[in-house]
């Protein structure tokens, strides 16, 4: 297919048009008074959202060059959401403002490479000032405030997230699911839970709930398949002398071994239960090791030179309580050493940082949460499917932003943090580097101005008023008052502000230093040929009707 090439200003102007259209659609969602955007779906009801990244993801433009510009900024919004959970609209507004200011200067003759260098230096200096101004998240109240703001000022969601984080800790897994009713709920699973239930319903100890509960139990962990009773008989005899219940976690237990265990359980000879090991392949081995560390046991594996026949009681893990239903096993109060658990947690965190696969990262985070003390499930309720999707998106965003706040700390919100940080930056740059520096200094006012405009105020007037002051002074767009932002609980995670600025500068630099674009020429489809009318020849005979 033939390609068309656009050069210099004509290329950049078309790219800018795409960025402008994306920005204009996304900017209306910004701030506590942001508006909704209605999005047509290929099937079903349209979706309604106030989430910037959801709007950005839907945008495809007909002009191929403009669309390239829009797609680049869309990627920035997505990356900001992935890394920080929030700040997508901030990143989009910043990228547009930087590109707009930069394009004006480059069209006037500034050197794009020098301008880029100045922009990078200014952004780095502002981020350093943001870090100095940040403070650690102190307690549940501040976590609630961050979550509430990220959930578009929904205090109920903010409180649910704060409760969940309080119960499972900052490394715990918090998942979001759809509730069956219209009420929001929080469900917390203490201890380590994995998705394997009992191998036989005859292991049940509570017939009403159909669960098996073992108190102060031993845990046998092995990556072997147990099919013969003689494999585990010596160990069973040793545990019987101790008078404690036993949970067997193995690759599988089948045939004679399972039958014998069930019969002895029913006769009251053994207080025992058996489940399959969680996971598959190498992940199964790692999860068995996790359980071993949590319970102070040892995985009996031939790879380690250990066999079931010669296993000692010292190899068994211990737990205060184990609850098993048909789908899940929960181990509470594992008796492993806390320093061993901490070492394992640190090891998994290192693996999370180094992996590039989203799937592997998700599975590692699940393992981390199981070791760190639990899983919380936020169940989101809504009256309709459209409302459910919109609310679920908000909860996901708020959750990620809250984790970002706990990780790196918080700064004043409402777009004021960037202005405060910029006030403390004074770089001695020259020529076109200085132009790049000044572009950033003007562009960082855009988020605050847009928040004010969406709330019905004059953006320029609000920015000027905030610039006259120092410290935590900012603009509360909810009521139009100038307040101490920390005292009012109007705060943003540092990570959100940092990543939004870094990503915006990165994409703007790429766009400003673009000198040519290449795109396919759309072929005009020929009009379909007229259908063959040959079959109508007989109409000639109609002359006889005259």
From Swiss-Prot:
SUPFAM superfamilies recorded for this chain? GroEL apical domain-like, GroEL equatorial domain-like
Q: Which Gene3D superfamilies match?
A: GroEL, GroEL-like equatorial domain, TCP-1-like chaperonin intermediate domain
The UniProt entry's GO biological process terms, in alphabetical order, are: chaperone cofactor-dependent protein refolding; protein refolding; response to heat
Q: Which UniProt keywords apply?
A: ATP-binding, Chaperone, Cytoplasm, Isomerase, Nucleotide-binding, Stress response
Question: What is an example of a Pfam family matching this protein?
Answer: Cpn60_TCP1
Q: Name one GO molecular function term.
A: ATP binding
Location in the cell: Cytoplasm
The UniProt record lists the keyword Metal-binding:
no
Highest taxon of source: Bacteria
The UniProt record gives the binding positions of ATP as 29-32, 50, 86-90, 414, 492
> Per the record, what are the reactions this protein catalyses?
ATP + H2O + a folded polypeptide = ADP + phosphate + an unfolded polypeptide
GO cellular component annotations of the record: GroEL-GroES complex
Known EC number(s)?
Answer: 5.6.1.7
- InterPro entries documented for this protein: Chaperonin_Cpn60_CS (IPR018370), Cpn60/GroEL (IPR001844), Cpn60/GroEL/TCP-1 (IPR002423), GroEL-like_apical_dom_sf (IPR027409), GROEL-like_equatorial_sf (IPR027413), TCP-1-like_intermed_sf (IPR027410)
Q: What subunit structure does UniProt give?
A: Forms a cylinder of 14 subunits composed of two heptameric rings stacked back-to-back. Interacts with the co-chaperonin GroES.
Write down the NCBIfam families for this protein, in alphabetical order: GroEL, PRK00013.1, PRK12849.1, PRK12850.1, PRK12851.1
* Family, per entry: Belongs to the chaperonin (HSP60) family.
Q: Function of this protein?
A: Together with its co-chaperonin GroES, plays an essential role in assisting protein folding. The GroEL-GroES system forms a nano-cage that allows encapsulation of the non-native substrate proteins and provides a physical environment optimized to promote and accelerate protein folding.
Q: What name does UniProt use for this protein? A: Chaperonin GroEL
Species of the source: Helicobacter pylori (strain ATCC 700392 / 26695) (Campylobacter pylori)
């Amino acid at each position: 297919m033939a390609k068309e090439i656009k050069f210099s200003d004509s290329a950049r102007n078309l790219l800018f048009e795409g960025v402008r259209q994306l920005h204009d659609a996304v900017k209306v969602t910004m701030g506590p008074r942001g508006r909704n955007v209605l999005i047509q779906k290929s099937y079903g009801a349209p979706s309604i959202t106030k989430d910037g990244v959801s709007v950005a993801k839907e945008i495809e433009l007909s002009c191929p060059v403009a669309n390239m510009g829009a797609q680049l900024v869309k990627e920035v919004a997505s990356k900001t959401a992935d890394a920080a959970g929030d700040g997508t609209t901030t990143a989009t507004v910043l990228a547009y403002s930087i590109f707009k200011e930069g394009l004006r200067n480059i069209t006037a003759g500034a050197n794009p490479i020098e301008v880029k260098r100045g922009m990078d230096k200014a952004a780095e200096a502002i981020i350093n000032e943001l870090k100095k101004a940040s403070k650690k998240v102190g307690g549940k109240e501040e976590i609630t405030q961050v979550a509430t703001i990220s959930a578009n000022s929904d205090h109920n969601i903010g409180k649910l997230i704060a409760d969940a984080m309080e119960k499972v800790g900052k490394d715990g897994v918090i998942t979001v699911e759809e509730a069956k009713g219209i009420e929001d709920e929080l469900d917390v699973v203490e201890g380590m839970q994995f998705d394997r239930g009992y191998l036989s319903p005859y292991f049940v100890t509570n017939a009403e709930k159909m669960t098996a509960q073992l108190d102060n139990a031993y845990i046998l962990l092995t990556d072997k398949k147990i099919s013969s009773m003689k494999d585990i008989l010596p160990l069973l005899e040793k545990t019987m002398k101790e008078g404690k219940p036993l949970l067997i976690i193995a690759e599988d237990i089948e045939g004679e071994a399972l039958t014998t265990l069930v019969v002895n359980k029913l006769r009251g000879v053994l207080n025992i239960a058996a489940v399959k090991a969680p996971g598959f392949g190498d992940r199964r081995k790692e999860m068995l090791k996790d359980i071993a560390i949590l319970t102070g046991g040892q995985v009996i594996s031939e790879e380690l030179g250990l066999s079931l026949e010669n296993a000692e009681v010292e190899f068994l893990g211990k737990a205060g309580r184990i609850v098993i239903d048909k789908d899940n096993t929960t181990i509470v109060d594992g008796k492993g050493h806390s320093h061993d658990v901490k070492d394992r947690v640190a090891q998994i965190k290192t693996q999370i940082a180094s992996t590039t696969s989203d799937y592997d990262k998700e599975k590692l985070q699940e393992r981390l949460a199981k070791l760190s003390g639990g899983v919380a499930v936020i169940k989101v309720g809504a009256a309709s499917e459209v409302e459910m999707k919109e609310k679920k998106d908000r909860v996901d965003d708020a959750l990620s932003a809250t984790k970002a706040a706990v990780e790196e700390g918080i700064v004043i919100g409402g777009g004021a943090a960037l202005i405060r940080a910029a006030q403390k930056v004074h770089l001695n740059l020259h020529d076109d580097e200085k132009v790049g520096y000044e572009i950033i200094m003007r562009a960082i006012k855009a988020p605050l101005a847009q928040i004010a405009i969406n709330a019905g105020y004059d953006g320029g007037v609000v920015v000027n008023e905030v610039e006259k002051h120092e410290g935590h002074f900012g603009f509360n767009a909810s009521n139009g008052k100038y307040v101490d932002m920390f005292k009012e609980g109007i705060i943003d995670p540092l990570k959100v502000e940092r990543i939004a600025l870094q990503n915006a500068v990165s994409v703007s630099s790429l766009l400003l230093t673009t000198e040519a674009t290449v795109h396919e020429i759309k072929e005009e489809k020929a009009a379909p040929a007229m259908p063959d009318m040959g079959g109508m020849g007989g109409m000639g005979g109609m002359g006889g009707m005259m």
